[in-house]
């Protein structure tokens, strides 16, 4: 799979992890009547993935005609299930050591907004005939959370492996990393932002993300 395709798919699986809301509980209840309910972490992945694909199919025409509606839809759920501050801390890596919480949040917000702004439109071109299958669930070392291994089943191609790393935050499972065919969201952007962060402060990098001077998935300069 080409890098650009991986980035587009990364956006989709990130969104599918983020966009579970009240209707997702319907999927959970329906599943419980036919087979033993999966764990809460696995159900998070299954229900949210199903939700995003279903919603894309139902509202595709609306979103194509009104990009602002797509952005609002994504942003309205972004904070619900994605632990963006923790993920941002992991992306910052060594640069997060000793950093103020406010600076990390500033970077987290700028990173999330830039990601969805650049790749959000890719959602409209994605194949909604995909099915999601949860394969396994494994505890992460050190009690850091759980890895939920899943596959996106395509009618015209090999399954796409997608792993979600989730952890408990205030009694709720939240996603902090997604790996598509072994490509990690956290590691991808840690590699991109390492060089800029060696030259500039976290607020400066966040500001450049906000203005578009620097873009996620770019070369670090937005050029």
Where are the regions a protein language model picked out?
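Bacterial N-terminal signal peptides that target proteins for export
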Residues: 2-16, 24
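Sec/Tat signal peptide C-region and signal peptidase I cleavage site
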Residues: 22-28
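Compositionally biased, proline/threonine/alanine/serine-rich low-complexity intrinsically disordered stretches
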Residues: 28-50, 54, 207, 211-223
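Early exported N-terminus immediately downstream of N-terminal targeting peptides
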Residues: 35-119
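Solvent-exposed loop/turn segments at secondary-structure junctions
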Residues: 96, 113-114, 139-140, 153-154, ...
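Surface-exposed, charged secondary-structure patches
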Residues: 117-160, 212-223
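Short beta-strand edge/turn micro-motifs at domain boundaries
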Residues: 159-187
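Low-complexity, intrinsically disordered terminal/linker segments enriched in charged
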Residues: 177-223
């Amino acid at each position: 799979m080409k890098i650009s395709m991986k980035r587009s798919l990364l956006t989709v699986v990130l969104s599918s992890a983020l966009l579970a809301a009240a209707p997702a509980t319907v999927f959970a209840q329906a599943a419980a009547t036919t087979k033993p309910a999966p764990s809460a972490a696995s159900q998070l992945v299954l229900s949210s993935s199903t939700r995003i694909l279903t919603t894309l199919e139902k509202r595709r025409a609306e979103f194509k005609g009104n990009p602002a509606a797509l952005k609002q839809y994504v942003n309205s759920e972004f904070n619900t299930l994605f632990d963006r501050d923790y993920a941002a801390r992991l992306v910052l890596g060594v640069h997060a050591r000793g950093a103020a919480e406010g600076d990390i949040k500033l970077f987290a917000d700028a990173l999330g907004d830039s990601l969805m702004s650049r790749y959000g439109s890719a959602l409209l071109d994605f194949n909604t005939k995909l099915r999601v299958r949860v394969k396994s669930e494994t505890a992460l070392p050190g009690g850091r959370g759980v890895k939920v291994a899943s596959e996106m089943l395509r009618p015209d191609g090999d399954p796409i492996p997608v792993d979600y790393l989730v952890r408990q935050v205030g009694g709720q499972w939240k996603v902090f990393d997604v790996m598509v065919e072994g490509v990690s969201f956290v590691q991808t952007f840690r590699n991109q932002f390492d060089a800029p962060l060696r030259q500039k402060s976290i607020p400066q990098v966040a500001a450049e993300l906000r203005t578009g001077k620097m873009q996620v998935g770019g070369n670090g300069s937005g050029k």
